């Protein structure tokens, strides 16, 4: 695990214990089961792909550790509607505070304004966080293979499945991809960012995508800024993308989303 992920795991585990002390797991799971019905995340991507379109997971992100503040004018419900109007298939919403200035309230408020399924974008180290995500209304979780071992990854995916949620399994290299393919999830995210150097290259997607079986959906993540990037990924068989920063920096998010998808 990289030094960055080790630091993140330390504060996340402290957050989890504080949250569990404030609301025990059984109570959180009960809230999860009473939450608004799950919106099928993978099916929303499949529908766009079946229609010959690029399935965009549009990210609502205020800041990042590498870039600092990305969008000062940050209004999650307004951004959610802009993405939906622009043709996004799903939303990704940061709930991590220390590194990304995210919050659960952003997910709750944004999801209430749209009909799109929503990913809780965060660093998950405990099944408590899966119950928490569903209680807030999330329809999908992210499992980062660079941050967890195989047993924990499976526990997270199975917890999500138990709540009717989907899971994106994120990988950065061949070894992580091999581990990810052993998990019962249809969604494989290829992150083009090197977690040690923070450099991005779409060549990562080009290298890994052909290794993924055709019954999975491959999602390109990081380093996607233009319609040319989208076309490049489609050439290697990637018809779904997760994009945040490049859209968050635009004044007219709806127009920028349409341009990214359609040119």
From Swiss-Prot:
EC number(s) reported in the record: 4.1.1.48
Catalysed reactions, as listed in the record: 1-(2-carboxyphenylamino)-1-deoxy-D-ribulose 5-phosphate + H(+) = (1S,2R)-1-C-(indol-3-yl)glycerol 3-phosphate + CO2 + H2O
Of which family is this protein a member? Answer: Belongs to the TrpC family.
Write down what this protein is called.
Indole-3-glycerol phosphate synthase
The cross-references to Pfam families, in alphabetical order and at most eight, read: IGPS
The record's keywords, sorted A to Z, are: Amino-acid biosynthesis, Aromatic amino acid biosynthesis, Decarboxylase, Lyase, Tryptophan biosynthesis
Would I find Transmembrane among this entry's keywords?
no
Q: Supply the source organism for this entry.
A: Azorhizobium caulinodans (strain ATCC 43989 / DSM 5975 / JCM 20966 / LMG 6465 / NBRC 14845 / NCIMB 13405 / ORS 571)
What does the record list as GO biological process?
Answer: L-tryptophan biosynthetic process
Q: What is the lineage of its organism?
A: Bacteria, Pseudomonadati, Pseudomonadota, Alphaproteobacteria, Hyphomicrobiales
- GO MF annotation terms: indole-3-glycerol-phosphate synthase activity; phosphoribosylanthranilate isomerase activity
Q: Which PROSITE patterns match?
A: IGPS
Q: Which CDD domains match?
A: IGPS
Query: What is the main EC category here?
Result: lyase
Quote the pathway field. Answer: Amino-acid biosynthesis; L-tryptophan biosynthesis; L-tryptophan from chorismate: step 4/5
């Amino acid at each position: 695990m990289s030094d960055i992920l080790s630091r993140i795991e330390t504060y996340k585990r402290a957050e989890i214990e504080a949250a569990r002390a404030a609301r025990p797991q059984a109570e959180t799971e009960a809230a999860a089961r009473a939450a608004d019905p799950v919106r099928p995340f993978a099916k929303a991507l499949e529908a766009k792909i079946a229609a010959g379109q690029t399935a965009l997971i549009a990210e609502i992100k205020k800041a990042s550790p590498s870039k600092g503040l990305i969008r000062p004018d940050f209004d999650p419900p307004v951004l959610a509607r802009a993405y939906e109007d622009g043709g996004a298939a799903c939303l990704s919403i940061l709930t991590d505070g220390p590194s990304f200035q995210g919050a659960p309230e952003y997910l709750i408020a944004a999801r209430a304004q749209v009909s799109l399924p929503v990913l809780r974008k965060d660093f998950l180290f405990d099944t408590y966080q899966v119950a928490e995500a569903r209680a807030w209304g999330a329809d999908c979780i992210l499992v980062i293979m660079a941050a967890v071992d195989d047993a924990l990854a499976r526990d997270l995916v199975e917890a999500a499945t138990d709540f009717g949620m989907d899971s994106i399994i994120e990988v950065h290299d061949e070894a992580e991809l091999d581990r990810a393919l052993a998990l019962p999830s249809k969604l494989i995210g290829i992150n083009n960012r090197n977690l040690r150097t923070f450099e991005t290259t779409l060549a990562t997607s080009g290298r890994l995508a052909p290794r993924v079986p055709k019954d999975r959906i491959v999602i390109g993540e990081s380093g996607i800024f233009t319609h040319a990037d989208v076309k490049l990924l489609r050439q290697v068989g990637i018809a779904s993308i997760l994009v945040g920063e490049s859209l968050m920096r635009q004044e007219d998010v709806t127009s920028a989303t349409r341009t990214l998808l359609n040119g």
